[in-house]
Each structure stands twice: as C-alpha cells, then as structure tokens.
C-alpha cells in the first residue's frame, strides 16, 4: 500500500454537526483508515487552534499530522501533542502584504470606525478578523478597504460572513494567496505528495477552491444544495460526489470521506472491504 495524504474540512465534513444523520460506525472506520502507517491526516479549517483542539476533544477525532487553520493563514505540524507553527508558510504568503503583519494592516485600517477587532485568539500574523454591524453597507465597505490597501500595494482577500446567532457581521482580511488550495499545494510539495496519492474532502462554499481544482476531491453526501449545484455545473473530472451505499453507509460526513478515498485509491478500497468482511 502506498503512502497517501488525506486533507479534510472539519465542520459538517468530518464533524457530524449538520442536520443529516451519521452512519453508525463511520467515525470508527475513519479512525481505522487514518491509523494506517501510510496515512498522513491533515485538517483544513477556518477554525483557530483552540477551537480545533476543542473539536478534537468533543468529537473524539483522531489527532492529525498537520493542521491548516485560520482560513489558510496558518499551518501546524503535530508531533505527539505538540503543535509546531510552520514558519515557512508565513514566509510563503508574506510577500502579499510586502512583509507587513497584523498590526501594520490594522493601523492602515484605523480610519474605518465600523471595524472592531475580534478577540485575540481569532487574530494571527497574517489574519485580521473584525466585527461589523449588520446595518453597514458591506459592498461599499469592502470596496473602500480594498482601495485603501491597494494604495499601499497590499494584496488582500476580504472574506465576509454573518454570525446569525450573535447577529453581527464578520470580516476577515488575509493575504490574497492565503487559502485552503494554496496551503494544500504547499503541503503536498513540501511533503512529496502528488495528485496520485492526495485526496481532499469538503462540504461547503468555503471548500470550492479545492473541490473545483485538479486535486482529487470528494464532496460528502450531506453537502449544501448550492455547493452541489455549483460542482454539477463545473463538471470537473477530479471531483467525486459521495452517493452512499459504500460498505452500507450513507455517504454523510466521515462515511463520505471514506467512500471518496476508496474511489481514488484502489488499494484502500480493497483494504476497507477486507476489514469489513473480517468483522
């Protein structure tokens, strides 16, 4: 069996925190899969470290080998229980901001009174996260921020979302090259993985850049309807949509991840079926 890299989103992909049911035994089979010595497991998530560790504890998730966190702005190597910040990734994305960091960019945006910095744990060297009142004209705000940053030759990606529960807007300011796809490619290159032994799994619009790339990917069966529509229109050859039925499971969450890995890696398909028969 050859070595393989499995990169997966967390919320509603590996973590069964959506409205769809989880197949009994699916997470146990996932743990068995990633415990193989040939497997390198990477979590790819918008969560920051504390929330990732909380999820690992709350949902009894396997400890990964790598974590791509904070919407692609941070990469960690995990050795035993030690999280090692991968400084080389910081150097990779730093040129987008001309070597400037969090506090420098924050100072550039000090003239926007509607921006309130989020808590310290939601910030990092290359990520500014703000709260924004919902009554704000968001398109104008984003346009004005982009104009301000371009005046300083800062190449940034602005990500807008809404915290429905708290009724507040959320705005992330990131280097333009800090994203899931670039981070996964960086990891593949540094660790010697190819398209022939890498699989990504996701469920939402935040995963589309990878799902629609040339990296083999699986969309779990519980994915958002809008995402399913987007990928259907794209008709990419390197995307597998979990259907359910593999090993009697429904294709949701970890069951869909397993189904997708088996689709791309025949040796894993054979191994999983043998393990299932042995039960």
Describe every region a protein language model picked out.
Residues 2-20, 203, 211:
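Asp-based phosphoryl-transfer active-site loop
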Residues 22-24, 222:
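A short acidic/small-residue loop/turn micro-motif
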Residues 1, 174, 181-279:
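Mg2+-dependent phosphoryl-transfer enzymes with acidic/Ser/Thr/Gly-rich catalytic loops
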Residues 4-6, 65, 198:
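The start of beta-strands in P-loop NTPase/AAA+ ATPase cores
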Residues 108-199, 204-213:
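Conserved acidic, metal-coordinating active-site core of Asp-based
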Residues 24-119:
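Active-site phosphate-binding/coordination module
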Residues 78-86, 171-175, 262-265:
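Short, surface-exposed amphipathic charged segments that create phosphate/polyanion-binding patches used
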Residues 17-21, 44-46, 176:
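Short, flexible loop segments at the rims of nucleotide/cofactor-binding pockets, characterized by
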């Amino acid at each position: 069996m050859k070595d393989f890299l499995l990169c997966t989103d967390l919320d509603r992909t590996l973590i069964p925190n959506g409205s769809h049911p989880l197949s009994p035994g699916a997470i146990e089979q996932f743990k068995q899969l990633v415990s193989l010595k040939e497997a390198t497991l990477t979590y790819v998530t918008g969560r920051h470290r504390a929330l990732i560790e909380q999820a690992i504890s709350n949902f009894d998730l396997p400890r990964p080998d790598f974590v791509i966190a904070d919407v692609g702005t941070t990469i960690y190597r995990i050795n035993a229980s030690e999280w090692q910040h991968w400084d080389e990734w910081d150097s990779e994305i730093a040129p987008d901001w001309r070597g400037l960091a969090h506090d420098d960019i924050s100072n550039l945006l000090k003239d926007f009174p509607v921006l309130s910095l989020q808590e310290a744990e939601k910030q990092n060297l290359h990520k500014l996260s703000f709260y924004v009142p919902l009554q704000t004209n968001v398109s104008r705000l984003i346009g004005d921020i982009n104009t301000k940053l371009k005046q300083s030759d800062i190449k940034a990606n602005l990500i807008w979302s809404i915290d429905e529960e708290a009724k507040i807007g959320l705005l992330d300011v990131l280097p333009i090259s800090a994203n899931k796809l670039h981070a996964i490619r960086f990891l593949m290159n540094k660790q010697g993985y190819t398209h022939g032994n890498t699989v990504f799994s996701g469920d939402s619009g935040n995963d589309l850049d990878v799902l629609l790339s040339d990296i083999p990917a699986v969309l779990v069966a519980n994915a958002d309807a809008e995402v399913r529509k987007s990928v259907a229109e794209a008709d990419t050859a390197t995307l597998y949509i979990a259907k359910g039925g593999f090993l009697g499971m429904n294709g949701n969450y970890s069951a869909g991840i397993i189904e997708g890995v088996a689709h791309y890696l025949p040796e894993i398909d054979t191994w999983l079926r043998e393990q299932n028969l042995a039960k």
